């Protein structure tokens, strides 16, 4: 929000300097980004009147003038501006003047004609960059008066960076309220009178989309003359607020926007066909905007329409076909309240950003529409003439925002701020803020005005009290708190321990957004409905994640584009699964997820160069499961997952309960997800890896272990894990290790079969095993494999 300091001081004028005012606003939460003079330094520039003007005898593009500057004799000046003519009031730099850029005005001759000064343009005085001829001043500008004094150029433009919740301060009125509160001053509202209708013309208004637009006011104004210039006092206030003067109608609506904070729009009445309807866009409906851009409107876009066509994108941008031009004689003026949800994100969707959408997205005062209408009408009639009809209003009270009172507890206020503020002071602060206040000795009941739509809970009021009381007035004090030793169960693993275990294997911890791109998430989880945010940060972050994979995939894709060859990330966090049976309709599950892509390890002379594969990631997961002290309880079972490669994916089970997934991302997603190398992922429920049994000390056997190798031929599609699980379930207590060390398919093995070689390590804790006992145990294993898998010993 950029504005003129002098304009603000017309509303409230504290006895403090510009610097002190800026500091005061910043400390109250309205951060001042910049304070700049509205004009560069120059002097000896006065108001003049061209009393003679004729062509230069020796130059086609020059004119010879005599200018009255309030002295005994007029000044001879040669001018090259096309708009120089007899009778206009101008800005004259007299001999001796110094203009911006240290440009000094001296007596001179141009093509033989004396020139004792210069008729100035806005650019030459450093006011605006555009060079559109010399400055033309109003006819009542006093000849001879210093130009800086006449335009009050000893002023500053203040630029405030407002947080999104303070939409009420996107106006002079709103900032003046704040300054008045901070300085205990009343705000002087400029005098404005309600305009009495002088004609009976009206347009009826219907609200087909009442929820999106619960209040709409319109007024017909006829016989306006839009060729009249906008008064210099208004154009200067607009310029100092960063807005260029265009024409009287646009200037007035912009002025009201800055003064009151309420956007308005004007239509050419003669271009309208029938009455006004505020509705949602029809399928495939198109609108040519004021910038001549043709857009196809989405069906959730709110539009202002007549009986035949859409006229404007409500709260965002006007349409060209109904726009006001210099030749317009009759206009229809709009003042409406659009719900923030109806406008939010619409401008960005169509590649637009306007002052109107900026305010409507943050919220405007739902009670301000008539005030804005009367103010704009008054200004338009004063500048352009014409006659105004009565104000027509359509309102759906049920959809207008309702403000509930807020309770502020004295004990809560003191606890949060850490300082005790006298109850009378708190009451005074709340009343100065314009709130309705009652206090019963323990708590305040506070009624919130319609323009403070950012206040809804007790903490909001605590913040208001703190910033008006003054953060600097709150004395620093060391925090006082009781420190207690916390009990940490040895049977409970922390997420830090799990992440550290993965970091030790070369992973880096990542933190990604819980909001993800719905298109990318739908690719991987097309059968899982996701929660859609009503007010997303952006369209690309509008869905809650149903897995941590989308965020991790985005991190890998980002790094692959930056030539990173070894990528491994681990993350813990929540995934959000829609579930009507869960609290608030969403099931939040804590998980630990990982992703690997690129090379298996960094380049090193002692290591071969190979890409990461499924078994690298499976080994990482097994190391993670080993942290539980019960890795044997988990097993990997080949399964299908729509996000994963059908031949390189598995579900992770603990007993009969599925607790996670692992596999290679399906190659068909690589291009859409921005991946250029094979990528492997895993995800586990955090609850199953944070629990572990307490360690039990067992004596180490003093007797030797015995190894036997067992090679069996089984079906080619049989997973080795199933064989190992079957052997472990035989119940041989002497079995201490079982390991697959060879897989063979080829000569000597029948078609459709594979040879699996396992090492079996046996050891008894009480004695040395004899050969007969070992043979008996191995026979049990072989018989089990034969009966369950039709396995045969390999020759």
Swiss-Prot record:
Residue ranges of domain FDX-ACB in the record: 701-794
Subcellular location per the Swiss-Prot or TrEMBL entry: Cytoplasm
GO cellular component terms, semicolon-separated: phenylalanine-tRNA ligase complex
Record's keyword annotation contains Iron: no
GO biological process: phenylalanyl-tRNA aminoacylation
Keywords: Aminoacyl-tRNA synthetase, ATP-binding, Cytoplasm, Ligase, Magnesium, Metal-binding, Nucleotide-binding, Protein biosynthesis, RNA-binding, tRNA-binding
B5 domain sequence ranges: 401-476
Description of how the protein assembles with itself and partners: Tetramer of two alpha and two beta subunits.
HAMAP family, A to Z: Phe_tRNA_synth_beta1 (MF_00283)
Family: Belongs to the phenylalanyl-tRNA synthetase beta subunit family. Type 1 subfamily.
Protein name: Phenylalanine--tRNA ligase beta subunit
């Amino acid at each position: 929000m950029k504005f003129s300091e002098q304009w603000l001081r017309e509303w409230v004028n504290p006895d403090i300097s510009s610097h002190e005012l800026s500091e005061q606003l910043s400390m109250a939460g309205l951060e001042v980004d910049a304070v700049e003079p509205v004009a560069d330094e120059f002097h000896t520039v006065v108001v003049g009147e061209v009393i003679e003007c004729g062509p230069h005898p020796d130059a086609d593009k020059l004119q010879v003038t005599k200018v009255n500057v309030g002295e005994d004799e007029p000044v001879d000046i040669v001018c090259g501006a096309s708009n120089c003519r007899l009778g206009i009031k101008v800005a004259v730099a007299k001999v001796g003047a110094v203009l911006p850029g240290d440009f000094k005005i001296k007596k001179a001759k141009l093509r033989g004609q004396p020139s004792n000064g210069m008729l100035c343009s806005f650019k030459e005085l450093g006011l605006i960059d555009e060079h559109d001829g010399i400055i033309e001043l109003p006819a009542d500008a006093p000849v001879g008066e210093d130009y800086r004094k006449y335009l009050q150029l000893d002023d500053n433009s203040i630029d405030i960076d407002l947080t999104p919740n303070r939409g009420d301060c996107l106006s002079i009125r709103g900032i003046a309220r704040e300054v008045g509160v901070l300085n205990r001053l009343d705000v002087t509202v400029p005098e404005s009178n309600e305009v009495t209708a002088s004609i009976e013309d009206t347009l009826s208004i219907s609200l087909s989309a009442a929820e999106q637009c619960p209040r709409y006011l319109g007024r017909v104004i006829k016989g306006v003359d839009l060729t009249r210039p906008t008064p210099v006092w208004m154009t200067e206030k607009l310029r100092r607020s960063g807005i260029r003067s265009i024409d009287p109608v646009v200037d007035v609506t912009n002025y009201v926007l800055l003064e009151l904070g309420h956007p308005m729009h004007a239509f050419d009445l003669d271009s309208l066909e029938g009455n006004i309807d505020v509705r949602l866009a029809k399928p495939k409906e198109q609108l040519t905007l004021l910038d001549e851009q043709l857009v196809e409107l989405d069906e959730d876009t709110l539009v202002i329409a007549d009986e035949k066509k859409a006229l404007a994108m409500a709260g965002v941008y006007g349409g060209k076909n109904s726009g006001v031009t210099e030749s317009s004689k009759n206009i229809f003026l709009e003042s409406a309240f659009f719900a923030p949800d109806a406008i939010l994100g619409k401008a960005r969707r169509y590649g637009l950003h306007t002052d109107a959408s900026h305010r409507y997205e943050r919220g405007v005062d739902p009670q301000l529409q008539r005030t804005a209408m009367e103010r704009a009408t008054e200004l338009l009639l004063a500048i352009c003439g014409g006659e105004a009809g009565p104000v027509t209003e359509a309102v759906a009270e049920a959809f207008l925002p309702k403000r509930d009172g807020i309770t502020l507890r004295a004990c809560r206020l003191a606890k949060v701020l850490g300082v005790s503020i006298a109850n009378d002071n708190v009451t005074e602060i709340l009343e100065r803020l314009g709130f309705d206040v009652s206090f019963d000795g323990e708590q305040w009941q506070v009624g919130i005005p319609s323009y403070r739509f950012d206040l809804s809970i007790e903490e909001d009021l605590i913040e208001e009290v703190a910033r008006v009381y003054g953060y600097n007035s709150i004395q620093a004090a060391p925090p006082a708190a009781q420190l207690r030793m916390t009990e940490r169960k040895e049977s409970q693993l922390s997420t830090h321990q799990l992440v550290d275990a993965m970091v030790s294997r070369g992973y880096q911890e990542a933190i990604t957004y819980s909001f993800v791109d719905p298109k990318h998430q739908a690719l991987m989880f097309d059968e899982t409905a996701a929660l859609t945010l009503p007010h997303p940060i952006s369209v690309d972050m509008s869905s809650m994640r149903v897995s941590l994979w989308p965020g991790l995939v985005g991190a890998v894709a980002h790094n692959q584009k930056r030539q990173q060859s070894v990528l491994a990330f681990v993350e813990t966090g929540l995934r959000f699964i829609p579930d009507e049976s869960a609290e608030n309709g969403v099931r939040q599950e804590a998980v630990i997820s990982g992703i690997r892509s690129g090379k298996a390890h960094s380049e090193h002379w002692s290591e071969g160069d190979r890409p990461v594969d499924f078994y690298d990631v499976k080994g990482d997961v097994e190391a993670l499961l080993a942290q539980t002290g019960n890795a044997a309880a988990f097993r990997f079972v080949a399964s299908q997952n729509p996000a994963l490669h059908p031949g390189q994916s598995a579900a992770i089970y603990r007993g009969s309960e599925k607790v996670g997934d692992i596999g290679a991302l399906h190659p068909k997603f690589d291009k859409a997800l921005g991946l250029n190398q094979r990528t492997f992922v895993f995800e586990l429920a955090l609850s199953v890896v944070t629990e572990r049994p307490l360690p039990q000390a067992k004596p180490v056997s003093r007797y030797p272990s015995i190894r036997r190798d067992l090679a069996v031929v089984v079906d080619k599609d049989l997973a080795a894990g199933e064989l190992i699980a079957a052997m472990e379930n035989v119940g041989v207590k002497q079995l201490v290790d079982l390991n697959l060390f060879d897989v063979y398919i080829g000569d000597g093995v029948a078609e459709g079969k594979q040879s699996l070689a396992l090492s079996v390590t046996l050891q008894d804790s009480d004695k040395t095993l004899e050969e007969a006992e070992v043979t008996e145990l191995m026979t049990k294993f072989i018989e089990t494999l034969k009966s369950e898998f039709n396995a045969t010993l390999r020759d």
